[in-house]
Design a protein with these regions (language model features):
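Beta1/beta-strand and adjacent pyrophosphate-binding region of the FAD-binding site
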Residues: 42-55
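Core beta-strand elements of the Rossmann-like FAD/NAD(P) dinucleotide-binding domain
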Residues: 43-45, 189-200
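Conserved N-terminal/central alpha/beta ligand/cofactor-binding core
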Residues: 61-165, 169, 192, 204-224, ...
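An anion/pyrophosphate-binding glycine-rich loop and adjacent beta-alpha core
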Residues: 76, 235-372, 464, 469-554, ...
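Conserved beta-strand-loop-beta-strand element in the redox core of flavoprotein oxidoreductases
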Residues: 167-195
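A glycine-rich dinucleotide-binding beta-alpha-beta segment and adjacent secondary-structure elements
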Residues: 358-422, 452-465, 589-643, 648
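Internal hydrophobic alpha-helix adjacent to the cofactor/substrate pocket in enzyme cavities
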Residues: 430-451
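Extended, charge-enriched "interface" segments that sit outside catalytic cores
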Residues: 482, 488, 499-667, 671-674
Length: 675
């Protein structure tokens, strides 16, 4: 019946031995639904998003906002954008991504502000390029808020089910750039037997593809603790020619706060003046913040943990997937840093109305009894009770070099991948990919140009370019060190960089447009005032001496004075009444003052990075033919020919970033394709 429904020319699904075949009732789609059913459910959509995690939610919201009739299919409508691991958003580089998502009209920043219980700006002691916002969130409210957004988004419908295969047709276009063995997506099929037709499909399956959870020697199928697993999709995609791999991640035990002696722990408070993620004026900073707590492991704790190593699936060969380098389990840390007698643990609240705490730094798949015994030896945890143990999870992913920069697959037209299916880790990285996939799927259906962010435009651009150009051999997470143009990609200027693009796309609300125009106008207005204002030495020397810098010998422009270390606009307002009046009369808020100061102080560095970025962009303007036979170019090294043939870069700039392609290889391409 399913094969009849798939339609002429559609590919049959590959069979899998997992799970065993079982007889089950299915919803027949042989006859059209009744009039009553038609009112409740439409079976044809422009775009279908599979998966309701952080990537899926952003993808569905963006696609619908751009006018596509969109269906979001999720296994559990009670867990939209569920915080499966730590109850926090942001952090180093990740916070910049969230600000960029917000500037582009996404929802993650707004929902984080709405549900935050603590906010901190990390790396304040470093330069502004390193400042990274991070917020603890109320886990339950975060998911509930996403559900409210989705249920109130025009053009978006939701369906609770599990997709087990896709439906495709073989490409027959004689003028297509695609090879003859490639396909075009036509829809999805679910385990309930429903066939949904679609012009584009976005897969955001997270850790659910053949997910297998481990605690000690016990294992169970599932994409997350308490949830089911998705079978069939990996096997089906592989039957179309996709390459799949296996990765691993993990999560720590959840702690009952009532069993913890908090007097033995060191509280970690939020900022006194908390900022926020969203640039929208209606999005407010957190109030009534809740502290996190710092505690340390000991040598005794480590000895107990080592007792369980023989039963650890990480060390006994049970787990084959590759784990995240930068978020290791506690047993990984003990083996890698065997000389350390102590490791930091952070106890993070999961919400305002719960006693559940997340123990950051104690991710583990050791046996339950070992976890409990070790935790009871941590100071303040002597009487600890846990709600659930830590566990590791293995899942399938698809190497992202099989994607274009739009996140569309190279093998199947109008099929997009976003999130952990691409080998990334982290809510923020997933949400960014989902947003970009949703935008690009909509644009393609409207025959509009694709939306691709360059490496000098956004961390999102760095993220996607790294994925599709370099690929991954371990779960990928973003760091500021991955970006060549960190001074251009600051968290404070994400709106100035990206909101004009959101306006052009049609993703920016009227509130966002007005806020952007006001910020841009007032920032420049304040910079102009500072540039034009002359300051006499009698006005300023007292202030300069008070902060330990040399006094003026003659009058100077205020702009030049602000370039000095230790001088700030806030400090200058205490001695220059006209500057203070100008700021208040124009209703210039702290964020605009901060932005103006950064632009002035870092002007030289900003201009230098822009010059370098423009120079590198010339290589991005030299296009490479998608059907070019690199094996015929014998001047290239063998490794370069292999890598270029597999990845098929779109430009020489992209080719230059492929590992294994040398500067000499790039010179060969420049000569062949023309400088």
């Amino acid at each position: 019946k399913d094969s009849q429904q798939a339609g002429r020319g559609e590919k049959e699904p590959a069979h899998t031995a997992r799970p065993p075949e079982r007889k089950r009732r299915t919803i027949s789609t042989d006859r059209p639904p009744s009039a009553r059913a038609r009112k409740k459910m439409t079976y044809e959509y422009d775009i279908i998003v599979v998966g309701g995690g952080h990537a899926g939610c952003e993808a569905a919201a963006a696609a619908a906002k751009l006018g596509a009739q969109t269906l979001l299919i999720t296994m559990d409508m009670g867990k939209f954008a569920n915080m499966s691991c730590n109850p926090a958003v942001g952090g180093v580089a990740k916070g910049q991504i969230v600000r960029e998502i917000d500037a582009l009209g996404g929802h993650m920043g707004i929902i984080t502000d709405r549900t935050a219980i603590q906010f901190r700006m990390l790396n304040r002691s470093k330069g502004s390029a390193m400042w990274s916002p991070r917020a603890q969130c109320d886990k339950a409210r975060f998911s509930e808020s996403w559900r409210q957004v989705l249920e109130n988004t025009e053009n978006l419908r939701i369906w609770q089910d599990t997709v087990d295969r896709l439906t495709v047709e073989k490409r027959t276009d004689s003028d297509s750039e695609l090879s003859e063995n490639q396909y075009i997506i036509t829809g999805v099929h679910t385990v309930m037997g429903v066939l949904f037709k679609a012009r584009a499909v976005i897969l955001t399956n997270g850790t659910f593809l053949n997910g297998l959870m481990h605690t000690g020697r016990a294992s169970a199928p599932g994409g997350r603790g308490g949830d089911g697993v998705s079978y069939g999709l990996t096997e089906y995609l592989c039957s179309l020619g996709f390459e799949a791999g296996r990765m691993k991640t993990g999560t720590p035990a959840r702690i009952d706060g009532r069993s913890v002696d908090f007097t033995a722990l060191e509280p970690q408070y939020g900022d006194e003046k908390p900022a926020k993620f969203s640039f929208l004026p209606s999005s407010k900073s957190v109030i009534n913040q809740i502290p996190c707590y710092l505690v340390h492991t000991t040598a005794e704790v480590h000895d107990i943990l080592r007792e369980g190593f023989a039963d650890s699936p990480l060390f006994n060969g049970t787990i084959q997937g590759i784990g995240p380098r930068y978020c290791p389990s506690i047993e990984d840390k003990l083996r890698t840093f065997a000389d350390k007698d102590s490791h930091q643990l952070f106890l993070e609240p999961e919400g305002r109305e719960t006693n559940e705490y997340y123990l950051n730094g104690f991710s583990s798949s050791l046996p339950l009894d070992v976890q409990i015994k070790a935790l009871s030896k941590v100071r303040g945890f002597e009487k600890v009770h846990i709600y659930r143990p830590g566990y590791a999870i293995e899942y399938d992913y698809f190497p992202p070099t099989q994607l274009k920069h739009t996140l569309e697959t190279k093998r199947v037209d109008n099929l997009y991948f976003a999130g952990q299916i691409n080998g990334t880790t982290g809510y923020e990285e997933a949400a960014a990919q989902g947003l970009m996939a949703g935008i690009n799927a909509s644009l393609k259906l409207q025959d509009k140009a694709p939306f691709v962010l360059a490496r000098d435009e956004a961390y999102i651009g760095v993220l996607i370019d790294d994925l599709v150009t370099k690929g991954v051999d371990e779960p990928y997470r973003m760091f500021t060190s991955r970006a060549e143009y960190r001074i251009l990609l600051r968290q404070d200027n994400a709106d100035l960089r990206l909101t004009p693009k959101a306006i052009e796309l049609g993703l920016a609300s009227s509130e966002r447009r007005e806020a952007f125009e006001r910020t841009n106008r007032l920032t420049q207005h304040l910079i102009d005032f500072i540039r034009q204002r002359s300051v006499g030495k009698e006005e300023i020397n007292g202030y300069l001496q008070s902060i330990g810098t040399n006094p003026l010998e003659q009058g100077r422009k205020l702009y030049d004075i602000l370039l000095r270390n230790g001088v700030s606009i806030e400090g200058l307002t205490t001695v220059l009444s006209d500057l203070n009046s100008f700021i208040h009369e124009n209703d210039i808020d702290e964020e605009i003052v901060e932005e103006a100061e950064i632009q002035i102080k870092y002007r030289g560095y900003i201009e230098r990075e822009r010059f370098i970025a423009e120079k590198m962009r010339r290589l991005e303007n030299i296009r490479l033919r998608p059907d070019f036979d690199y094996n015929a170019l014998t001047s290239l090294t063998i490794e370069a020919r292999q890598k270029l043939s597999r990845i098929k870069p779109q430009t020489i700039g992209q080719a230059s970033r492929i590992p294994g392609v040398s500067p000499a290889d790039i010179n060969v391409l420049l000569i062949f394709f023309g400088r």
